[in-house]
Amino acid sequence: VFLPTERWTMDLKIFGKIIREKRGALRLKQEELSEKSGVAIKTIHSIELGKGNPAIKTILRLFETLELDFIVVSAKSL
């Protein structure tokens, strides 16, 4: 699903906040999340700031490590 740039930018900020809050709830430092997920610290930092363009593979690694569910919703239902 491709979202308009403005909407996707907002979603990235929300996504980053979710990652940061869940990491905090698990009391993990960015370095620890990096080691457990195989995602570079720089990438985690960018995602948490709502920046960058993370690959789906990266998102899935983080969600799996943080025990978050990844749900895909059809654009028609938005």
Where would I find each of the regions flagged by the language model?
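Recognition helix of helix-turn-helix/homeodomain-like DNA-binding domains
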Residues: 38-53
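Short basic helix-loop element that most often maps to the first helix and adjoining turn
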Residues: 17-32
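DNA major-groove recognition helix of helix-turn-helix/homeodomain DNA-binding modules
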Residues: 55-73
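Conserved hydrophobic/aromatic packing and binding residues within compact polymer-binding modules
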Residues: 19, 33-34, 44-47
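Residues at secondary-structure transition points
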Residues: 10-14, 28, 50-57, 78
